[in-house]
Amino acid sequence: MHLSQLLACALLLTLLSLRPSEAKPGAPPKVPRTPPGEEVAEPQAAGGGQKKGDKTPGGGGANLKGDRSRLLRDLRVDTKSRAAWARLLHEHPNARKYKGGNKKGLSKGCFGLKLDRIGSMSGLGC
């Protein structure tokens, strides 16, 4: 378990060091991301009542489709990475079930049958 935590920390530090710093003076300021529903809804509202058959100069419809697919792809990658981190940090979802094992151990009688409590305590099981 300690080894997996050490690897997770090392991976996190590596990812943070590779990530471009937001404090660089030449970098443009980042615009905060809006929820996916709002971002997709705004360009459709700006288009007005245009139909699919209407052509706009500059191919605005293709750009909208590309933005939407890029947004969906980014969301899918984010979900996959979160699932990977959850698996890494929590080795098994029911780890408590498997960690303890049996506290008292299975008391088996002469014929391999589990003894009841009275039989195991008094020795009358065999």
From Swiss-Prot:
It is found in: Secreted. Pfam families: ANP. Residues 46-63 have a biased composition (Gly residues). Residues 19-72 are annotated as: Disordered. Residues 24-73 form a propeptide. The keyword Protein biosynthesis does not apply. Disulfide bonds join C110-C126. It comes from the Eukaryota. Keywords: Cleavage on pair of basic residues, Disulfide bond, Hormone, Osteogenesis, Secreted, Signal, Vasoactive. Residues 1-23 form the signal peptide. Residues 26-35 have a biased composition (Pro residues). One of its GO terms (molecular function) is hormone receptor binding. InterPro entries: C_natriurtcpep, Natr_peptide, Natr_peptide_CS. One of its GO terms (cellular component) is protein-containing complex. GO terms for biological process: angiogenesis; blood vessel diameter maintenance; blood vessel remodeling; c-di-GMP signaling; cellular response to glycoprotein; cGMP biosynthetic process; chromosome organization; cumulus cell differentiation. Its main location: secreted. Belongs to the natriuretic peptide family. This is C-type natriuretic peptide. It comes from Sus scrofa. The lineage of its organism: Eukaryota, Metazoa, Chordata, Craniata, Vertebrata.
